[in-house]
C-alpha cells in the first residue's frame, strides 16, 4: 500500500510556491473500544437455560467481564514468545494449515502461559456427556463445540486464522484452519470447562472471528451415549489486532469500525488507508506515519528542530552560500515494528521522476519516534525550482 504525502512544497530562490493535493472524506468520529494487551482472559460461553446464552470476555484474577463487541485483543508484532507473537513457520508440510509458506512469518497466541495477551476458552452450563465420533476425538465427555463460521480481515495479506493444540508426545491436533476455506470441520471441542489452545494469524491486521458454541443437554443413555437436545448459541464476533498499525487504529476506533461485518464486506470507510474520519484532509495512513490523530482535526506541519507531531516540513535553508531545500519529518522507530518505509524525495518538476534523498541526520525523540532531516544536494544554480516530499509505504 503506497501513499504519498499530500503536501508537496517547491522552492525557487526569491519566492516560494506550494502545491497542496487534498482529498477529504467527511466521516463522523468514533470512540475506541477496550484494548487488552497483557492479561489472561477467556472467550466465555455461558448457557443460561431456555435457549439463552451469555457470551463475554471473562476476566480472570478478579478482572471484570467485557463485551466482545467493545473489546480488541492485541498481539504485538515482536519476536515470539518473549516479546510478542511473531514466529517463523517451520518448513514441514504439517504446518500448511497456518496459511503461510515455510520459513515465513506467522503470528501466534500460545496455548502455554504468556504474560502477554492469553485468551482461553470457557464454557458454563449443565452439558451432557456424549460420544463424539470426530476423528480428532473418539471418546465420551460433556463436550462443548466452538465453531468458526466467518472471519473478517483488514490488512495487506490473506488474513487466515487457525487453531490447534499441542498434545502429549509432540502431536499437533488441528481444530480450525481457514486457509482452505471454512467448513463444518472447523470446530474446537473441549470438555473441562476451561482450556487453552494455540491461535494463529497469517498476517498483520485486524481480524474479526465469529464463533458459535454448541452442546447437548441430555443423552439417550446408550453405550456409548448419543447426545440429545442440542443447543446452539448466537453467533458472536471477537476482535484481534495484529501489529502496530492495527493496534494504533484500535486505539481510536470502535471494533466494528476496524473490519467488515462479514468476510465479503469491504473495510469500513473510516479505517481505509485513504480514509479521513476527522475531516482534516490527512489520510489515515499519514496520520499514523506522522503522529497525528485520526479522531480530531489536527492538521499541522512539523515544527523544525522541536516538533513531535505534524506533516513533514519542507523549507529553504539559506544559512550557507548555496541555499538548499531541507525536508524534516517524524519517523516511527524500527524498534516499534511499524512496518512503514519512509522515502524522502526531491524533484525539479511535479511531472518528472522523483529522486531519493541522500544522507540523513537522525535525532531520537522518544521510544517510538525519531526526527529525520535530509538536504537536497542537487541544486545547480540560483534559478532552480525544487520540490520535496515524503512518500510512505505500509508493508
Listing of model-derived features with the role each one plays in the protein:
Residues 1-14:
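N-terminal secretory signal peptides that target proteins for export/translocation
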Residues 17-28:
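Bacterial N-terminal signal peptides
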Residues 33-193, 228, 241-243:
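Phosphate/adenylate-binding glycine loop and adjacent helical scaffold
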Residues 195, 203-207:
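Short tyrosine-centred short linear motifs in exposed loops/low-complexity segments
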Residues 207-215:
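A short beta-strand micro-motif common to beta-rich folds, especially ectodomain repeats
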Residues 219-235:
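Beta-sandwich strand segments
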Residues 244-395:
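Short, composition-biased motifs enriched in small/polar/acidic residues
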